[in-house]
Structure formats: C-alpha cells, structure tokens
C-alpha cells in the first residue's frame, strides 16, 4: 500500500494566527503536513523527511535582539523553503538581507506587482493578464534588502520587497498571506510550491486516509477489544464508523444518555449506529443520575465538573463489564494535539497524547487508539461522508460537552431540559426549512430561569423565557450575531410559544464575540 505520509511538508510555526490555516490549505491540495515550533529539536527537523519546509508568519520582529529564527539545519537540508510574512523576514535577516520596521502597519487588502515571475508567480494574474495580484497583508516590519542570490519578484506601492526568490536553491518568500481566501491566487501559489517545486504527490485523500487508518488500527490492537465513548458528536461518530470498518465486532461503544442531549438524540444515535450500521452500542440511560447530581447547583463551572465527573464514573462502570477491552478509542483531532503541546517558548506543537475525555481513572490502564489525531475538523467531516455517515450528522453545528447543562442558566431540572430540547429542535427545524442552517456557524436555544408575564386566552400567565442564539464565524475565536430575517424569527417564536406549554416569551441574542462568548455559560 502507498504510504500517504511519505510526501510531506513541515511547517515551522513562529506563532502566527494563520499557521493552522496554512496546514489546512496544504492538506486540501492532497499533501500531508505537520506543524512544529520554530525552536523544535533541529536533529528531528533534519530527520523528519519533509520534501519542503514552510516558515510561518508570527508576531515578533526580526529587528529586535533575540528574535525567533529558523534553525541552521533548515538551510543545510537542501530542501525547498517558503517563507510567509515573518517567515520571509527571518529568511532575509538570516541570509544576509535586511529588514526594517515600517512607519505604520500594513493590514488588509493590497495589490502586488509581479516584476520577475518565478516558479510560483509565472502566469498568475488577477487583472486580466497583467502581472498584478490581489493579496492580504498583515505586517509591521518588511524586507528592505533581499539577501545575496535572491531576486526581488514582486513589489507594492508601499514596500520594496513583497516577494523574493533564490530559484537555484528553491528558496522563496512572500510578505503577504497566500493561505487566506482574500489572496485570490493563494492556493495556486501554495500548489506550485508544494506540488511543482517540492514534487509532492497528492495522496492525502479521504479514501486513502481511511485505508491507512484501518491498517494502522488493525496493527495496533490486533485481536484485542476496543471501547469508545460515543457522544453523537462528529468526532466520536467518525471514530465509531472508522473503527467498525476496521475491527467490526471487537468495538464496543458506550453511549451515555445524560438527559441533556438534543431532542431525541439518543434514539437517533441508536438508529444510526446500532440498527443501520450494526455497531455494538451499549446505551446507558443515566438521566436520573444526572438530574439528581445537579439538583441545587447553579454555578456553571460546578455544573461542568459534575457532568464531566459523572460521565467518567459511568464510563468506568461500563468498561469494567467489558473484561476483554484493552484499548480506549478517542476522538482527539490535530488541533487538540497542537494545543496540548508545550515548549520553552510556549509555541511548540509536538504530537503527543491528549486526553479529550478528561480525567479517566488511572486504574483503567487502557491503551489509547486515536485514529483522527492527524486530522483537522474539516478533514474529519470529509472522512465521515466517505464512510457513509449522513451529511446532516457530519456537518452539524458544534454542541457543548456538558450539553444542555450549560444552556440552562442556573439550576438544571428535567422539566427545563425537556422544554429547551424541544425549543432548540423547533429553531433548528425552521433553519433547515428556510435554508439558513448551513449559512450560520452555530445556532441554539437557551433556557432563562425567569418568569415573564404573558397573556394566554383571557388570563395572565407567568411563564418561562427562551433565548435564541445564532452566530457566523470562521474560527469561533470571534463571531458576529447572525442577521436572520425578522419574518423567520417571528415564525420560530410563534412555533415555540404555541407548541410548548410553559413558554410565553422568545428573545433573540444580538451580542457579538467579544464581548459576549458564544455559549451563555
């Protein structure tokens, strides 16, 4: 079988907000890549076996002493190098060029003039054949003098070196960000570096990743049994489908129905995995235990801890019944791995174990199976579709680990959870009907534990308030509230109030992030 990890790119991260985006763009081209810190062990960088190295952007300044720099091994490797933003600046500074601080930062759209087309720029244009490109800039410093052996390949009205190249050594630098969509030819530039210059084959596809992981899992677990906590979320669902394909009956999924899930989610999970796919699923109806444990608790952090600890307790009880289970499968994905890494600089991204179940008892002594640990979320979704999971499940909006427990403000009660689950289902149903679901990044209902006066028939009634929240975001770090049509919101409000006894008022949350968070608790 072809090794889909053979042709790979190494990204050295200098702390840029866009570094993961570079990696995702390269993966989209069909090429495997990893993100390591700029100060990673140089011997490991040299021994990684990359076909090319990308130096990312970053917040530092090469004009200051002690600025982060690429290890000498990068230049000694003989590999193609592509410096982006700060990556180009450190390339210039380390190889005998010069950088300087600009009078003012350049942030936003810019027009680049290609003056000496190289392997990356040849034939590219956003202006009907003219050698001009529309790009996205985000920098304070810039390269003022290209290093010896480099040709200036592009300029702008504001900076003398917008791009440079040493074609003989296959070293390239650009001051702008090809990884963001605002740079219209960005993906074409990355393709030219990764595929044309570095010679990478495009083997990183959903079908190949599935085949590769099936082989790896079978080699790892042999004839042992594997246990998986199935939540109904995207990651654990894809792990369940993938492992079922790899080891069949040797997989047991434990689905803990907390009573805090989406409307009828427990039945949907059982229908999809147990009935439709034939996966062995143990369903634990634990709602009574959860509501008892949460009684009288209103602090959000305390609620999260109780919900998390109780899950671990129940999962432990169920795993003890499976005497032959030697492995625990988890839906750890690559951003989890990156975030869990640390170094002397705080910027290292070394692959190491990350427990997304959190706090599993030491005595479980199970080996870890993490078939998604190399993948970004968008890749996990593509795998899900390839594995035959319904698109509506794979592309669902995020749902918090503690479930409705953090969407009910204050104390959690069974009656609140049932009302909220139904209200949320109405909101989502109407979003789908109006073709608005995929246009929002996350949408949900929140239960407010305050009673508001309403009129039911001829009588006054004091009933609960439901808040609706919908946001649009690229990375969930910042978000705008979704400008849903008034008529649509009116339809949702009418349905919730008419169909749910106990709700007299529906409000819409128009707060951005920041200052508000996406979830209310």
UniProtKB/Swiss-Prot annotation:
PROSITE patterns for this protein: GATASE_TYPE_1, GMPS_ATP_PPASE
GMPS ATP-PPase domain mapped to chain residues: 204-396
InterPro entries to which the protein is assigned, alphabetical: Class_I_gatase-like, GATASE, GMP_synth_C, GMP_synth_GATase, GMP_synthase, GMPS_ATP_PPase_dom, NAD/GMP_synthase, Rossmann-like_a/b/a_fold
Record field: catalytic activity: XMP + L-glutamine + ATP + H2O = GMP + L-glutamate + AMP + diphosphate + 2 H(+)
Keyword ATP-binding in annotation: yes
Transit peptide listed as a keyword: no
Keywords, ordered alphabetically: ATP-binding, Glutamine amidotransferase, GMP biosynthesis, Ligase, Nucleotide-binding, Purine biosynthesis
A GO CC annotation given for this chain: cytosol
SUPFAM superfamilies (alphabetical): Adenine nucleotide alpha hydrolases-like, Class I glutamine amidotransferase-like, GMP synthetase C-terminal dimerisation domain
Domain Glutamine amidotransferase type-1: 8-203
EC number annotated for this UniProt entry: 6.3.5.2
Molecular-function GO terms, alphabetical: ATP binding; GMP synthase activity
Pathway: Purine metabolism; GMP biosynthesis; GMP from XMP (L-Gln route): step 1/1
Catalytic site: 85 (nucleophile), 177, 179
Residues that bind ATP: 231-237
Task performed by this protein: Catalyzes the synthesis of GMP from XMP.
Self-association and partners: Homodimer.
Protein name: GMP synthase [glutamine-hydrolyzing]
Organism of provenance: Stenotrophomonas maltophilia (strain R551-3)
Gene, per the UniProt record: guaA
């Amino acid at each position: 079988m072809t090794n889909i990890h053979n042709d790979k790119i190494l990204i050295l991260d200098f702390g840029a907000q866009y570094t993961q985006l570079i990696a995702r763009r390269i993966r989209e081209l069909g090429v495997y890549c990893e993100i390591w810190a700029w100060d990673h062990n140089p011997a490991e960088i040299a021994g990684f076996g990359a076909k090319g190295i990308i130096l990312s952007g970053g917040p530092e300044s090469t004009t200051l002493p002690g600025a982060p720099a690429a290890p000498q091994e990068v230049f000694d490797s003989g590999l193609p190098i592509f410096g982006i933003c700060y990556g180009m600046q450190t390339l210039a500074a380390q190889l005998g060029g010069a950088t300087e601080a600009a009078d003012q930062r350049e942030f936003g759209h810019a027009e680049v003039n290609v003056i000496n087309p190289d392997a990356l720029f040849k034939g590219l244009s956003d202006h009907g054949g003219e050698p001009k490109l529309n790009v996205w800039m985000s920098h304070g410093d810039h390269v003022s003098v290209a290093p010896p052996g480099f040709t200036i390949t592009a300029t702008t009205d504001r900076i003398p070196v917008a791009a440079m190249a040493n074609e003989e050594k296959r070293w390239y630098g650009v001051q702008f960000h090809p990884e963001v969509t605002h740079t219209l030819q960005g993906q074409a530039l990355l393709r030219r570096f990764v595929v044309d210059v570095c010679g990478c084959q495009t083997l990183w596809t959903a079908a190949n990743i599935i085949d590769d992981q099936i082989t790896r899992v079978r080699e790892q677990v042999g004839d042992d049994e594997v246990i998986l906590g199935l939540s109904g979320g995207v990651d654990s669902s894809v792990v369940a489908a993938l492992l079922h394909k790899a080891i069949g009956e040797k997989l047991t999924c434990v689905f803990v129905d907390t009573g805090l899930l989406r409307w009828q989610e427990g039945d949907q999970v059982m229908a999809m995995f147990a009935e439709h796919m034939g996966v062995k699923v143990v369903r634990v109806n634990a709602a009574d235990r959860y509501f008892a444990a949460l009684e009288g608790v209103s602090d959000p952090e305390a609620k999260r801890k109780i919900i998390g600890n109780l899950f671990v307790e129940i999962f432990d009880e169920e795993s003890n019944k499976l005497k032959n289970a030697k492995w625990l499968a988890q839906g750890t994905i690559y951003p989890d791995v990156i975030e869990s890494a640390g170094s002397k600089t705080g910027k290292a991204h070394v692959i190491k174990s990350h427990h997304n179940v959190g706090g599993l008892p030491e005595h479980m002594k199970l080996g870890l199976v993490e078939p998604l640990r190399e993948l970004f979320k968008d890749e996990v979704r593509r795998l899900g579709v390839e594995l035959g999971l319904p698109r509506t499940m794979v592309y669902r909006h995020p749902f918090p680990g503690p479930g409705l427990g953090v969407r009910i403000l204050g104390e959690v009660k069974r009656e609140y959870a049932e009302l909220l689950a139904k209200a949320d289902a109405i909101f989502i149903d109407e979003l789908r009907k109006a073709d608005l679901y995929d246009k929002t990044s996350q949408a949900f209902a929140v239960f407010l534990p305050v009673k508001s006066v309403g009129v039911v028939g001829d009588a006054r009634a004091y009933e609960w308030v439901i808040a609706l929240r919908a946001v649009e975001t690229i990375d969930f770090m910042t978000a705008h509230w979704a400008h849903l049509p008034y008529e649509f919101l009116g339809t949702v409000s009418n349905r919730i109030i008419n169909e749910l006894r106990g709700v007299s008022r529906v409000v819409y949350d128009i707060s951005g992030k920041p200052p508000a968070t996406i979830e209310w608790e």
